[in-house]
Structures are given as C-alpha cells and as structure tokens.
From Swiss-Prot:
This is UBX domain-containing protein 3. Ubiquitin-binding protein which acts as an adapter for ATPase cdc-48.1 and/or cdc-48.2, conferring substrate specificity. Together with ubxn-1 and ubxn-2, plays a role in hermaphrodite spermatogenesis probably by promoting the degradation of sex determination terminal factor tra-1. During mitosis, ensures the degradation of DNA licensing factor cdt-1 and the disassembly of the DNA replication CMG helicase complex by promoting the dissociation from chromatin of several of its components including cdc-45 and sld-5. Residues 67-223, 453-472 are annotated as: Disordered. SUPFAM superfamilies: Ubiquitin-like. The gene is ubxn-3.
Length: 613
C-alpha cells in the first residue's frame, strides 16, 4: 500500500527531505512524526536529533579513573597486575551542541602525582613517628624541667617557646614588682600604715640578701611596649617620643631600696591626699582638696589663689568640660597629678599652681581634675579611669613617668576634645616655671578655641545644609500635596460628571417610561375621512420652531390633548400650553381638563403654542 498516495505535493516533498536527512526508512513512522508536528520539517528533524542524543546518553558510561600510588618494590608488580579500563578521548569539537558532558578523559601524570601526595599526607604511622622522635625531643605536653635562677641554660628550639611563654607570665613592673626566689609574694597593705609592716619585710629581705654578692635583682618588666618620653628638666623641648621593643627577654635593673620605697607609706608621715580604700571618688577628691588647702592655702592670702579643683568623678568632669549645654562654657580639661615622693611636690604646688596668674587662668579657662598617685593602688585606679574614658595618651604618659621619672611630678596634662576623640595637647612638669606653665596653658586654650571655632563653623555649615535640605523637602512635599490636590479635584470632577451622566440617563429612562405610560392612555387618532362634525384639527407650535398636527374627537376630553403633548416629551411640569385667542389663554388654567372639546365649544381648527417654563 502506497502511504504517500494520499499526501499533497508539498507534504511528499517534506517527507522526502526528512527521510534523506534522518535516514528513516519506515515511512509510517516518518509520516506520523511530521503529522504530529503539523508538517514542520525543522521541528521534526530537531526532534529526531534529540531522540538520538537521548539514546546515546542511556549507553553505559566509561568513568575516568585515577590509579593508586605504588610504593617501594611492589610498584611495578601492582601496576602490571591492575586492570586498566579503556578511556575514550572525545575532543570538544566532536561533541554535539545538545550534549552537556564528556564521556571520559585520560588521567594526566600531574593528577596522579597530586593524588599520591594527598594519600601520603593522609597516612599516619603512629609507631614510626613516636619511635623516631621519642629519643631526641620531649613529647608535646611533657613537663620541662625548671632552671634555677642564675644557672646558664643552652636554649633549644623546643624549649625556647615554652620558656618565653612562662617568662612572660612572670612579668612585673615597678608598681607591682615580682618577688625574688624563696620569698612569698607580698600582699597589698594599706599605705596609711606609715610603712610599719613593709619596713619589717624590708629588714627580713635585707637579711636574706646578706649571703649574696649582688645588691641588685633582675626584675622582668612588661616588654610589649616601651615608651620613652623626653622629660629632662634641663631642656625646654617637651616633645614626646615613643619607642617599641619586641624583645620578650628584656629586664630592668631595680635596686631593692627603690622597690620597697614604692610600697611604703607617704614620706615624712604626711597624710595622703587620697587615702587607699576610699568609699567613693567624690569623697577622695574632697579629701584631696582639704589636704591641699591645708598644705598650701592655709592663710587668707593664699586661700584667694586656691585652685578650683573639680570634686566629681572623671565622667562628670569630662561632661562639664566638653559637653556643657551652653557651648560658650565649654573648656579644656586639665589634670593635676600629685606625687608626694617627688622633690617638686611642694615647690610646684605653692609657687606655680597657687600663683595668681596660673590659678586665675585655670579658674576661668579650664576644668581642673586632681588626683594623687603616691599609692600604687591609686595609680592603678587612675589608669583604669583614663582607660575607661578613652584617654590613652594621658594614660600612657602618666604610667611611664610614674615608673621612670617621679621627679617630673606634679604633672599637669592638657586634654582637648576634637571630633569626638580626646587628644593630649601638652603637659607641664614639676620642674617647669610659672612662665612655662602659663605659656603651655595659654597654648592649650588657644588650640581648643580654634577647635571650637572649627566645630562651630562645621556645625553652621551642617545646619545650613540641613536647612536647605529641609526646605527642599518641604517644597517637594508641598509640590506633592498640590499634585495630589489637583488629582483629587480632577477625580472629583470626573466623578461628578459620571454622576451627572448617570442622573441624566436615569431621568431619560424615567421620561421614556413616563411617555410610554402616558401614550398608552391617549386614544387613537381619528382617520382623516371622519366627518368634520365629529373631529377637530389642532396644530401645535413646538419650541425651537417645530410643528405637529393631530386630530381629536370632539367627545374626547381636553386631558387627551395634554396627554398627547406629554407623550411627545412636553410634560405640563416643564412646559405651558396657550391657545390662539387674544390675549392667549393657558389651557391648563382656563379650561377644565375633564370636559370634552364639544362642551368647551372648542373650534374646529385650533393652534396651540407650547412654551418652555
């Protein structure tokens, strides 16, 4: 049976091209494929190719393999006895566009080497590792024998790291010295005991040192950062230099007498300005002011130049200095740090700080915050206060000078606030003269004044920008409001028009219904051939020049005429009807509408004028 007999010429041509391209010998399958695709030759060929790819993908795949690494003398034997699967190399240009993966590829030597290395790294031989390293080195976590002080030790790579770590854990400072060997650590004692307990410990310590030939002990200090400040009293240059040292084995030679002196009570039995163990910072500061006044401003003459010490905690002093509600009252912050063991403690306070010029300038231009660091505990507390207040510069200089240059105290540090950060401008040492102190204080006032002027200028510019932005935003909002109002008005107008159209349409519908109702009550017009004695002819003069003719029977009522006009859209509530008499008579007012035309002697021919009310 010839399957192509029922096909059209173009279909037979497409069938021929399809079978030639796809090598499909089954004409029934070919015709079915083309017919299912509405004889679209391109889609049929594409469907055939996709089916071929699908059949190819279902073939078993030859996976790429990575040979295992061979080791030792068995490498050749294992490689020869191992079954090597066939690997098919397919070039990229040989792959059809519709295929998304390669059948397989050969394993390169680099990949084999990489895998071998990974396998070797993953092998762990506990027995060989422990046997090779056990005799030469200590096991991890094993105890390292402790060396006696003064014994020379040959450093080894394995012991240097642990010894450095243990050494760093035993670091000390001059404020908290490390006790020597065979001596129990000293417990903190109150500085108000006038050195009684510490003196006895000092004697016992000296007795223990009589058998030694050295009069100095090596005390490790904190090696992380070494700050060196130029605090020579003979120089006027107050520049600060900070040096960094990374050596963890640094030591500082400290004499025993100096170590004991740091922990002893106030010199000469004086009452400390800030006692140890105070209950609150405010009480400590008030005690400082009372002791300072008793020492240096006890007479009426000196009381007039008493420095205006601030007696609230440091956060309150910072707020008073830099965050006053009135910007005109904002001032730099001045720290006065006293140290009773300094040789300048009395001279600087009486001759410089309590002088008329210095005290007056501080009273009007600074917020003066005092503290006493004679006691180590008070020094540590003050350093903590500075750290909490983010005043690292002040903390650094006070800490370093307290450890190395006590004669630099009393210290006056000038601090300003710039861009939400605190900066140390300068500091006055206990060896400075009144003129030098005045120069530095005036310089601090001038610098903070410049900072305030810059901040005020920036604040004004910021306020102007904000004002412009607010104005633009207000104008934009006003424009949006106006646009919204116009849109609402337009929407309202459209809504009103819609309602008006609906009303008119409704009225027209009602009028149409009314007309139909009224027209149903009007009798039929008599024919023209009716006797003249039985009919009347009425001519209607309509608004806008229109005319109409109608015949009525004489026995019909005048209401019939009114109903006829109403059916034409001229209802009596909107129009008036006048006859042709002179003067004109309104029909609805001068005639009884229930009477017929004969009773009212209506003329055989009448003309009615219809006028809009």
């Amino acid at each position: 049976m010839d399957l192509t007999a029922s096909l059209e010429d173009d279909q037979r041509e497409k069938l021929r091209q399809y079978t030639e391209f796809t090598h499909q010998q089954d004409y029934e399958v070919a015709i079915g494929t083309l017919a299912s695709l509405n004889w679209n030759l391109e889609q049929a060929i594409e469907a055939h190719l996709m089916q071929e790819d699908k059949n190819d993908d279902e073939d078993p795949e030859i996976l790429e393999t990575i040979p295992a690494a061979a080791s030792g003398r068995n490498a050749g034997a294992s490689s020869s006895s191992r079954f090597e699967p066939e690997v098919i190399n397919i070039e990229d240009d040989e792959m059809p566009a519709t295929r998304g993966r390669r059948r397989g590829r050969a394993v390169t030597p680099d990949e084999t080497t990489t895998v071998d290395n990974q396998v070797k790294r993953l092998r762990i031989d506990d027995g060989s590792s422990s046997s090779s390293n056990g005799a030469a080195t200590h096991h991890r976590g094993a105890a390292i024998p402790r060396q006696k002080r003064g014994q020379a030790t040959e450093p080894t790579p394995s012991s240097s790291g642990s010894s450095s770590a243990s050494f760093s854990s035993r670091r000390g400072t001059r404020a908290n010295p490390v006790p020597p060997p065979n001596q129990e650590p000293a417990h903190p004692e109150s500085a108000r005991q006038n050195g009684g307990i510490l003196a006895s410990r000092h004697n016992n310590h000296n007795n223990q040192q009589n058998n030694h030939h050295h009069h100095h002990q090596r005390i490790p200090i904190n090696p992380r950062r070494v700050d060196v400040f130029n605090v020579d009293s003979d120089e006027d240059d107050d520049s600060m230099a900070i040096a960094y040292e990374d050596d963890d084995d640094g030591v500082h030679e400290v004499h025993h007498s100096e170590v004991v002196a740091r922990g002893s009570g106030p010199p000469n039995g004086r009452i400390p300005m800030i006692p140890d163990g105070f209950s609150s910072v405010s009480d400590a500061l008030r005690n400082f002011v009372a002791i300072f006044s008793d020492r240096f401003c006890s007479t009426p003459q000196t009381q007039a130049f008493m420095p205006p010490f601030y007696t609230e905690p440091l956060p309150a002093a910072v707020k008073e200095a830099f965050d006053h509600p009135n910007s005109e009252h904002r001032r730099p912050l001045l720290f006065y740090i006293n140290h009773d063991r300094s040789i300048a403690a009395n001279i600087f306070a009486s001759q410089v700080l309590c002088s008329e010029t210095v005290s007056t300038l501080i009273r009007h231009q600074y917020v003066l915050f005092p503290w006493d660091i004679t006691s180590d505990s008070n020094l540590m507390l003050f350093l903590e206060y500075l750290q909490a207040a983010n005043m690292g510069d002040v903390r650094t200089i006070i800490q370093r000078l307290a450890m190395s240059k006590i004669e630099s105290f009393p210290l006056m540090a000038i601090v300003v606030k710039e861009r939400n950060s605190y900066r140390l401008v300068d500091y006055c040492r206990g060896t400075d003269t009144s003129d030098q102190v005045m120069e530095k204080l005036l310089s601090g006032v001038s610098e903070y004044s410049d900072i305030r002027m810059n901040e005020q200028s920036e604040r004004r510019e910021r306020e102007e920008r904000e004002a412009i932005r607010n104005q633009q935003e207000a104008e934009y909002k006003a424009s949006l409001a106006a646009d919204k109002a116009r849109m609402e008005a337009k929407q309202q107008e459209i809504e009103e028009q819609r309602l008006e159209e609906e009303r008119k349409l409704r009225e027209e519908e009602e009028e149409c219904v009314r007309r139909q109702t009224v027209a149903s009550t009007v009798p039929e017009e008599p024919p023209a051939s009716a006797p003249l004695a039985e009919i009347i002819n009425v001519k209607f003069r309509l608004p806008e020049g229109g005319q109409d003719m109608r015949r009525f029977r004489r026995l019909e009522s005048i209401q019939t005429l009114i109903n006829y006009l109403s059916s034409k859209g001229y209802s009596p509530d909107k129009f008036k009807y006048f006859n042709s008499d002179f003067p004109k008579k309104e029909i609805t007012r001068h005639f009884d509408l229930s009477h017929n035309f004969a009773d009212t002697k209506w003329p055989a021919r009448e003309q009615i004028f219809v006028e809009e009310i």
